[in-house]
């Protein structure tokens, strides 16, 4: 005769095998689908990175080309005539240096920064510092446009 322990062992073994079989029917297909989605994530990430690198290369080349064109255009423009300030000289004050620096260089190429020797005086008025900076930069670059 079979003991109770052996009987329950075979019952539990049968339940374990049956549950394992039915769970593998769900786990293996879901694992395959998960693998397919993981491949998709990696491939789309690669494509995204490559398209970003190509767009970055196009942007850098276009930016360099436009900078060259802008430099050529800046060299071909005529320097603007120096205008006399509308306000009396008593309202003018030095910007940063108490001594008068060298006058503006008429043949200078436009640069990103305005140095101390490029700016002689600025009028004391209610204009903002940004507007005065734009006027100085526009006059220095030789533009014929008036910013006001």
UniProtKB/Swiss-Prot annotation:
One of its GO terms (biological process) is ascospore wall assembly. It comes from the Eukaryota. Residues 29 are lumenal. Disulfide bonds: none annotated. It holds the Pfam family Osw5. The keyword Transmembrane applies. Keywords: Endoplasmic reticulum, Lipid droplet, Membrane, Phosphoprotein, Sporulation, Transmembrane, Transmembrane helix. Interacts specifically with the seipin complex FLD1-LDB16. Only a fraction appears to associate with the seipin core components, suggesting that it may be an ancillary subunit of the complex. Found to interact with many mitochondrial and peroxisomal proteins. This is Lipid droplet organization protein LDO16. The lineage of its organism: Eukaryota, Fungi, Dikarya, Ascomycota, Saccharomycotina. The gene is LDO16.
């Amino acid at each position: 005769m079979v003991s109770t322990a052996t009987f329950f062992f075979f019952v539990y073994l049968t339940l374990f095998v049956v549950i394992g079989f039915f769970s593998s029917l769900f786990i293996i297909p879901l694992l395959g689908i998960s693998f397919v989605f993981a491949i998709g994530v990696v491939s789309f990430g690669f494509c995204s990175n490559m398209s970003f690198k190509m767009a970055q290369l196009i942007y850098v080349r276009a930016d360099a080309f436009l900078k060259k064109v802008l430099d050529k255009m800046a060299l071909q423009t005529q320097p603007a005539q120096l205008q006399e300030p509308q306000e009396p000289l008593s309202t003018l004050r030095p910007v940063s240096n108490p001594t008068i620096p060298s006058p503006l260089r008429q043949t200078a190429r436009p640069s990103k920064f305005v140095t101390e020797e490029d700016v002689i005086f600025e009028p004391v008025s209610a204009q903002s510092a940004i507007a005065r900076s734009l006027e100085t930069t526009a006059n220095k670059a030789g533009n014929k446009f008036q910013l006001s």
